[in-house]
């Protein structure tokens, strides 16, 4: 999208999007992926528990977990419209064992089994960031996350910039 849309191109290069990741990694970053994640009212899909870096490592051959996601809410995100759920601190464990699921969602995903999720949640709990349109969150590529289906009457559309250290 950032290659075809001037507004998305400006967003992808905006200092507020890029500088936190540059500061964290201590070097310039590049755009690994630019995604628009639309969870339509009443029928937005579920995304199973996973780590983005697991997919990037297995499918894209990204050598190290020096990557972050910047998520911008284009709609209000509330407890009803399928918000992201994070397991705090799970990124500190590095890449976890995962199984390749090619059928549940429209995108093949390396998913984490339920027993592992139970143990992680017992240790770190669960959080589901919510906020008005325009809110921004950053999360590490190894942070375990998922989202439920959107059965509410409200869309939940977000833009994701996946930024990676240039040395990676």
What are these regions (language model features)?
Residues 38, 76, 91-93, 144-145, ...:
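Short, catalytically relevant binding-site loops at active-site mouths
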Residues 2, 50, 91, 140, ...:
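Histidine-centered active-site/metal-ligand motif
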Residues 19, 43-122, 126-127:
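Catalytic core of non-heme Fe(II) oxygenases with the double-stranded beta-helix
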Residues 5-10, 117-127, 146-148:
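Active-site rim elements
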Residues 97-101, 133-138, 142-168:
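Non-heme Fe(II)/2-oxoglutarate
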Residues 1-60:
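Non-heme Fe(II)-dependent double-stranded beta-helix
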Residues 34-36, 70-72, 159-163:
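A structural signal for short, well-ordered beta-strand segments
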């Amino acid at each position: 999208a950032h290659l075809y849309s001037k507004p998305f191109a400006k967003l992808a290069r905006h200092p507020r999007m890029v500088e936190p990741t540059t500061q964290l990694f201590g070097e310039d970053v590049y755009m690994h992926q630019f995604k628009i994640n639309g969870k339509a009212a009443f029928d937005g899909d579920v995304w199973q528990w996973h780590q983005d870096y697991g997919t990037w490592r297995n499918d894209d051959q990204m050598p190290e977990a020096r990557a972050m996601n910047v998520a911008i809410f284009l709609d209000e995100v509330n407890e009803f419209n399928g918000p992201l759920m994070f397991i705090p601190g799970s990124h500190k464990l590095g890449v976890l064992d995962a199984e390749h699921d090619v059928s549940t969602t429209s995108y093949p995903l390396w998913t984490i089994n339920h027993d592992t999720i139970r143990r992680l949640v017992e240790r770190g709990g669960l959080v589901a960031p919510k906020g008005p349109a325009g809110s921004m969150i950053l999360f590490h590529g190894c942070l375990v996350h998922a989202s439920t289906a959107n059965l509410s009457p409200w869309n939940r559309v977000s833009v994701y910039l996946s930024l990676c250290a240039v040395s990676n």
